[in-house]
From Swiss-Prot:
Catalytic class of the enzyme: transferase
Name of the protein described by the UniProt record: Probable nicotinate-nucleotide adenylyltransferase
Gene3D superfamilies assigned: HUPs
CDD domains hit by this protein: NMNAT
Involved pathway(s): Cofactor biosynthesis; NAD(+) biosynthesis; deamido-NAD(+) from nicotinate D-ribonucleotide: step 1/1
Gene Ontology BP term (one): NAD biosynthetic process
Domain of life (superkingdom): Bacteria
Protein function: Catalyzes the reversible adenylation of nicotinate mononucleotide (NaMN) to nicotinic acid adenine dinucleotide (NaAD).
SUPFAM superfamilies per UniProt: Nucleotidylyl transferase
UniProt keyword ATP-binding, yes or no: yes
One MF term in the entry's GO annotations: ATP binding
Organism: Dictyoglomus thermophilum (strain ATCC 35947 / DSM 3960 / H-6-12)
Alphabetical list of PANTHER family matching this protein: NICOTINATE-NUCLEOTIDE ADENYLYLTRANSFERASE-RELATED, PHOSPHOPANTETHEINE ADENYLYLTRANSFERASE
């Protein structure tokens, strides 16, 4: 089986995440995409929504796609959510499967600053939602060259929205329709998140 892994704070999950996951799934013929909300993200600000709220929003957003599955493994683990630990756990559970880590261009740009990036690439290939490698550091360009058989660039139609923009719109009382699935919008409103 070919499994995609999309980690993130998902604060909140939005159509950009879903579109990237679906586009990568189709393009690379992935059987499943696991959405993995972080508990304590090492490279981002602390999420505003609780772990439970973010998990439930991801569940709601992915419910209609049988190829999408939400795994709470980082939420259940103590401490900072390092992807190397998640990949290690998944590779032991899915030892005969191919793992593909899905990363946006911004996350990939900082990949060498992550905890044990070489352990990650040893166990999983990487699919980068990107337009090319022109703006990467020389270290990252060398890394790409050394692992060119495990790093793939996916030129996909970019969905120009951010979770930060969505949170700001909610706080200002503006619509988030067409930015998040309706079920997620309803959940945010019902629970008064981001106000």
């Amino acid at each position: 089986m070919k499994i995609g892994i999309l980690g993130g704070t998902f604060d909140p999950i939005h159509y950009g995440h879903l579109w990237f996951a679906e586009y990568a799934r189709e393009r690379f013929k992935l059987d499943k995409v696991f959405f993995i909300p972080n508990k304590i993200p090492p490279h981002r600000e602390t999420p505003l929504a609780t772990s439970k709220q973010r998990y439930e929003m991801v569940l709601l957003a992915t419910l209609s796609n049988p190829c999408f599955e939400v795994l709470p493994i980082e939420l259940e683990r103590e401490g900072i959510s390092y992807m190397v630990d998640t990949i290690r756990d998944l590779s032991s559970c899915f030892s005969f499967d191919e793992l593909y880590l899905l990363l946006g261009n911004d996350a990939f740009r900082d990949f060498l600053k992550w905890k044990e990036p070489y352990k990650i690439i040893e166990k999983a290939s990487i699919i980068v939602g990107s337009r090319g490698i022109e703006d990467y550091s020389s270290d990252l360009k060398n890394f790409i060259k050394n692992f060119e058989n495990k790093i793939f660039f996916l030129d996909f139609p970019y969905y120009p929205i951010s979770a930060k923009e969505i949170r700001e719109r909610v706080k200002r009382g503006l619509s988030i329709k067409y930015l998040v699935p309706e079920s997620v919008e309803d959940y945010i409103i019902k629970n008064g998140i981001y106000l």
